[in-house]
Amino acid sequence: WGEREALQLLEDISDYAQKNKEQNKEQNEGQNKEQDKEQPYYIGSAVVFLRTAHGETYFETIDGQQRLTTLTILACLLKHQEKASWFEKPNLSYDHRKEADEALMMLVNGQLSQHPSAQNIVSVYRLLEKHLQPMLTAKRLDLETFADYLFEKVIILRIPVPQDTQLNHYFEIMNTRGEQLEKHE
C-alpha cells in the first residue's frame, strides 16, 4: 500500500476505537453495564494457502499482503511509542523480498532501512509516525486504548484456498485489477 491507503487504515481504526470508547463510556454511565463490549472492526480479508516446510506449518499470503505489511509497520511504531517489549519479531516474511524482511526486522529494533527497495516500508512508517499522535489527540484517545483496540478488536478474515488450487493462476486472476507483478513474483 502507499501512503494514502496506510493513512486511511489508521484513520479507520482510530475512528472505530473512538466510537467504541464513547459507547462504552455511555454504557458505563447508563443502565446496562453487561453490554460493555467493544465492537470489532473488520478490516478485510487475507487469502492464504496452508503450507508445510521443514516441519513447520504456515500460511502463505496470496492476497492481503499489503494490508498485513501495513499492520506490521503500525505494530512496530506502537512498540516504540509505548516503549513495549512485547513485539520481538514480525510474523510476516517475504520469500522473494529479503530487503523487505530486513526492513521490518530493523523497524522492530528501532532502525530504518536505507535499502532502496525498502523505502516504501520506511515512508509508510514515517507517515504513521507523523500522524498517529495528532490523530489520537484529536479523537481523545490515548496510545494504550488505541493499541488495545487494534490488537484485540481489529479482525482480518483469513480465507484459506483449497489445497488443490493452482496458486499462480489464482494469484494472477486476483491481481489483474491491481499493481502489476514483477517477474520474480
Task: State each model region's role.
Residues 27:
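Cationic, low-complexity basic patches in intrinsically disordered or flexible, solvent-exposed regions
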Residues 1-24, 35-185:
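Glycine- and hydrophobic-rich flexible loops that cap the catalytic core of alpha/beta enzyme folds
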